[in-house]
Amino acid sequence: MVATPSTSSQTKGVVRQVIGPVLDVEFPAGKLPKILNALRIEAKNPAGQDIALTAEVQQLLGDHRVRAVAMSGTDGLVRGMEAIDTGAPISVPVGEATLGRIFNVLGEPVDEQGPVNTKDTAPIHRAAPKLTDLETKPKVFETGIKVIDLLAPYRQGGKVGLFGGAGVGKTVLIQELINNIAKEHGGVSVFGGVGERTREGNDLYEEFKESGVINADDLTQSKVALCFGQMNEPPGARMRVGLSALTMAEHFRDVNKQDVLLFVDNIFRFVQAGSEVSALLGRMPSAVGYQPTLGTDVGELQERITSTLEGSITSIQAVYVPADDLTDPAPATTFAHLDATTVLARALAAKGIYPAVDPLDSTSTMLQPSVVGDEHYKTARAVQSTLQRYKELQDIIAILGLDELSEEDRLTVDRARKIEKFLSQPFFVAEIFTGMSGKYVKLEDTIAGFNMILSGELDDLPEQAFYLVGNIDEVKAKAEKINSEK
């Protein structure tokens, strides 16, 4: 959905050059569109088919020309076609009418459910909230996932990064978080699918319908709005769809005064699209081929995701890590903006520990006694130190064997292996694959369970009893079952 001014105020230009998704458009002298304005091209291609294309102005070239990036394919576009300056940035629909619907970068519904029943729209480009409007009191956000709530708790109104290479479970973790938050907190979510697989978007939509997050019979009862710019779309769409989703979330926060969840999958694809656009616009590449404006591009998106005195946006962003290298400029730049990082490790996934969250690499600014309390803090640190000691002993075990360790170290290894197994958990959204019912574990149960392992109360239980269960009661029940089968 693009702002359409009255006919009298429209300025018309002519397409002079088309190179892939980049257009050069010539306008009358003194009537050049502003940077970030949307241009609209509606014409017929040489085969007689309709073309309806929106492009965003990126550069003013001189000689009355502007360079714009197309938000959809430019097939059939030819020089000489008319382009209209809409006089405003791209705008998207906002409010309750967006819930249960799927949109593209322009805010056009793509779910074949008819037009969106709202006149409320908002431009995708706007300033971040003022410093005086920000809420600064820290508050923990319970997810029901043991490893996250204990070792890297999320902040309400904070920004969380899910870091991991290909195929370690970022999208499944996001789906589980949306499911848990909709059911336990009853909150509204906005999902931004940025440059990911179309199949995953379709699976997510079907999953939401099955779990009731989207109510197919009465869309007004739905809890999520979805905005997609997938892998097959031009870089302009992938670069801007994150802003479209964020604009919808901002309306729920600022106008409806709600606490909103914004999921972005994947923030790396946003950077990647920016890099493609930057190269197409002729800018000199920076480190590892990224755009020279990498820090600015990421900052403009991230600074709008925040808590104000009116409401909060808690953002959970999947971050693909190229070649599992956390020092790559894209994940490294994203790190600077985050309150918590959940790092997914391939080594844990290979062991069958799901979610494959690395308990030593994952961090959170919330894990301090003044925020989470002494008991939580001490338990988390004791778990991490036990796992760290186990990691240090692994080389010795590999060379000399377990029998060469001291009694104390053997006990540490035994408890660490139980902790590692207990950090796994069956997910609601993975029930179809695992055949196990999902578990939501309350924070107090999580802390109590790990305290019992650390204190030695459960030393006599078999290790496999701790694998893929919810709380300690389930561990004991599973242990009894294992013992009875022997």
Curated annotation (Swiss-Prot):
Q: What does this protein do?
A: Produces ATP from ADP in the presence of a proton gradient across the membrane. The catalytic sites are hosted primarily by the beta subunits.
> How is it placed in the membrane, per its record?
Peripheral membrane protein
Write down the species.
Answer: Prochlorococcus marinus (strain MIT 9215)
Q: Which family does it belong to?
A: Belongs to the ATPase alpha/beta chains family.
Which reactions does this protein catalyse? Answer: ATP + H2O + 4 H(+)(in) = ADP + phosphate + 5 H(+)(out)
SUPFAM superfamilies hit by this protein = C-terminal domain of alpha and beta subunits of F1 ATP synthase, N-terminal domain of alpha and beta subunits of F1 ATP synthase, P-loop containing nucleoside triphosphate hydrolases
State the top-level EC class: translocase
Q: What is the lineage of its organism?
A: Bacteria, Bacillati, Cyanobacteriota, Cyanophyceae, Synechococcales
Where along this sequence does the record place binding of ATP? 164-171
Which GO-annotated molecular functions does the record name?
Answer: ATP binding; ATP hydrolysis activity; proton-transporting ATP synthase activity, rotational mechanism
Q: State the CDD domains in the record.
A: ATP-synt_F1_beta_C, ATP-synt_F1_beta_N, F1-ATPase_beta_CD
- Predominantly, its location class is membrane
Q: Which gene encodes it?
A: atpD
Q: Give UniProt keywords alphabetically.
A: ATP synthesis, ATP-binding, CF(1), Hydrogen ion transport, Ion transport, Membrane, Nucleotide-binding, Thylakoid, Translocase, Transport
Q: What is its EC number?
A: 7.1.2.2
**Location of the protein in the cell:** Cellular thylakoid membrane
What name is this protein filed under? ATP synthase subunit beta
User: In its keyword annotation, does this UniProt entry include Ion transport?
Assistant: yes
GO CC: one term? Answer: plasma membrane-derived thylakoid membrane
Listed under subunit, the entry gives: F-type ATPases have 2 components, CF(1) - the catalytic core - and CF(0) - the membrane proton channel. CF(1) has five subunits: alpha(3), beta(3), gamma(1), delta(1), epsilon(1). CF(0) has four main subunits: a(1), b(1), b'(1) and c(9-12).
Q: Which SMART domains match?
A: AAA
User: So which domain of life are we looking at?
Assistant: Bacteria
